[in-house]
Every structure is written in C-alpha cells, then in structure tokens.
C-alpha cells in the first residue's frame, strides 16, 4: 500500500501536538508554587511604658524561621523608609456618631504619612455594603483628602472584602513589598456584615502579600465588642496593632460610669467643650501613635534557610528576639507563606 509522506508528516505533527497538549494539561493540574526568596520583617520595639525603643542595632536582633536562626542581609532603621500605605475607611452606619472627628483625623493621618514625596505612596478604599477603590495608588495625599471631605457614611460593612481588595486589586509600585514596604490602616470598628471573604482568608492573603495591618478602632466608650477581635487578629498576625482612642477618653476623669445623667452615663456632658476636647485629643493621640510606629520600625530582610524539616511547610513561623532587654515588647508578623496559592 503506497504511503503518502505528506499525510504521514501531518499525522506525526498532530500526534506531537496532542502529546504536548497532554503534558501541558498534566502540568496545569499541579499547583503552581512560587517560592518566597526573601522575607521582610518590620519590627516594633516598645518598653514597659509603651515608648518606642529606637537605639538598637542589627547585632541586637535575632530572627528565627521555624526555630532556625537566620542571617539578616538587610537592616534598616531610617525614619524616611519608602512605604505604600492603604487607608481603609469604614462607611457603615456605625460611623455616623463621630464621623466628623474621624474624617478630620484620617485627613491628618494621610497628610502626615504621605508628605507629597515620591517614595511615599498611598491609596484610599472605603467600605460600606461593598468596598470601593476611591483613589488608586498615588503620592498625592491631597487628592485623597479632597475625596474624604465629600463622604457620608451609611449602609453595611464589608471590611474583609476591603482588606482583600487592598492586597490584590490596586496599582503596585516597583519594588514592593521590600522598598516600598506595604502597610494598611483600617479606620473602623471591626464589624463585618457584607463580605464574601472570611477573616481567615484575608489574614492569609495579607500574610502572603507581606502586608502589615494597623487599625484605628472606632468602637466607643470602652465597651468591648466581638467585632474588635477581628481587628486584633488581623493586626497581631501581620505585625501591626490596634489603637482604641475612645477606650481611654475618661482614664483621667473620676466619676465615669458612676454619675448618671439624662444624656447618658458620662462624666463630661455631651455637647460641652470639655467633652469635645477630650474626644478630639484621644483620637489625635492615637493618630500620632500610629504615625510614630509606622515610621520608627526596624525593618529586617533575610533569605530563608530552614533546613530539610522546614522546606515543605505551607506556613513558616517567625520569631524575633533582642539581646539583654527583658522588659520590652516586640511586634512583628507571625509568619509567612513560602509558596504562592494553588492556581
């Protein structure tokens, strides 16, 4: 039977394409893992009175990855470190009572952390029933302040979806997450009534993207709510902290919760100059604390050396210690994911 060489070549080509397609499909079924080559660890050190300890050097720190000490290759403690910071502003009904105060405080925080220099960038996300990227990543803080002035709260609260958006759906700056490093500040009470994402999911996506989360809690007058635990978990797991300005409004005032009044159980009557001054002072002290912490951190970087036992761990835990300082508190991320999520 005669052989048609052209047809034969075509058949071979089809066969090769089919085999190649099979290999591609087979490989596509495997999870795509992108290894983290370097880990960045911002660290805050405070003494037993909450004051920043700012005179430490590289040799004072020890960084452990899965219990194995690491060699720190980059150490930075300059106050002018490049940073990209996301402002996540609660627009739910719960913000209405003190909206004007937090509106003013957020504007102050934006202007302090983004002084119109290229190495400082930020973005603004609001969240009510759903998150919205109001201003994408930019060095222009005045643009964000202008948008902020026109806002009015109302609706539900999609906090977790807002965190997810901050980590995945904005314009990035060349060099992230190392220079600049990534920070998010949540201004809200921690409630979530509308999100599709869960608390666990957004903590993971923040850890994968090396984002440090801070929060300015708007929960009022020292009464703990379960929603505040959301803020605590997000900040502690990523190396940040929660400021609770309204919890301390009455710390220096006798009679709080023991002097009934028609306007409520306040030691300073609502609507008076004293009440307004205490409230504003507490909020702006918290703003100053956040600004100070973000700009005074020690930033360390290392290439993971975890030995055979730590190679395949899906989540690697970090521990940081300092020499000869027993009464200090260290805040840093709890760990990181060495591989990207399955695709």
Residue ranges: model-predicted function:
Residues 27-343:
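Scaffold/interface architecture of coatomer-like assemblies
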Residues 11-23:
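Bacterial N-terminal signal peptides
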Residues 1-8:
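N-terminal secretory signal peptides that target proteins for export/translocation
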Residues 9-10, 97:
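Short, low-complexity intrinsically disordered segments
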């Amino acid at each position: 039977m005669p052989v048609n060489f052209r047809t034969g070549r075509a058949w071979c080509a089809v066969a090769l394409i089919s085999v190649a397609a099979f290999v591609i499909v087979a490989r596509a079924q495997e999870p795509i893992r992108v290894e983290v080559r370097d880990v960045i660890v911002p660290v805050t050190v405070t003494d037993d009175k909450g004051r920043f300890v700012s005179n430490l050097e590289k040799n004072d720190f020890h960084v452990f990855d899965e219990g194995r000490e690491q060699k720190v290759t980059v150490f930075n403690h300059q106050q002018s470190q490049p940073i990209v910071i996301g402002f996540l502003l609660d627009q739910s009904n719960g913000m209405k009572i003190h909206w004007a105060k937090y509106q003013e405080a957020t504007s102050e925080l934006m202007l302090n952390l983004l002084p119109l220099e290229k190495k400082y960038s930020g973005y603004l996300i609001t969240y009510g029933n759903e998150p919205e990227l109001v201003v994408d990543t930019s060095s222009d803080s005045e643009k964000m302040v202008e948008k902020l002035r026109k806002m009015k709260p109302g609706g539900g609260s999609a906090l977790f979806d807002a965190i997810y958006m901050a980590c995945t759906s904005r314009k990035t700056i060349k060099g992230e997450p190392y220079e600049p490093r990534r920070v998010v500040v949540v201004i809200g009470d921690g409630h979530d009534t509308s999100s599709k994402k869960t608390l666990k999911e957004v903590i993971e996506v923040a850890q994968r993207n090396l984002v440090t989360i801070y929060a300015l809690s708007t929960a009022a007058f020292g009464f703990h709510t379960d929603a505040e635990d959301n803020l605590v978990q997000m900040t502690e797991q990523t190396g940040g902290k929660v400021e609770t300005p309204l919890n301390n409004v009455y710390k220096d005032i006798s009679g709080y919760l023991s002097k009934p009044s028609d306007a409520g159980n306040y030691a300073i009557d609502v609507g008076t100059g004293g009440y307004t001054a205490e409230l504003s002072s507490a909020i702006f002290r918290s703003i100053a604390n956040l600004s100070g912490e973000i700009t005074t951190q020690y930033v360390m970087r290392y290439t993971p050396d975890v030995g055979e036992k730590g190679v395949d761990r899906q989540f690697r835990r970090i521990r940081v210690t300092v020499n000869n300082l027993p009464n200090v508190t260290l805040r840093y991320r709890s760990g990181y994911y060495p591989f990207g999520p399955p695709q």
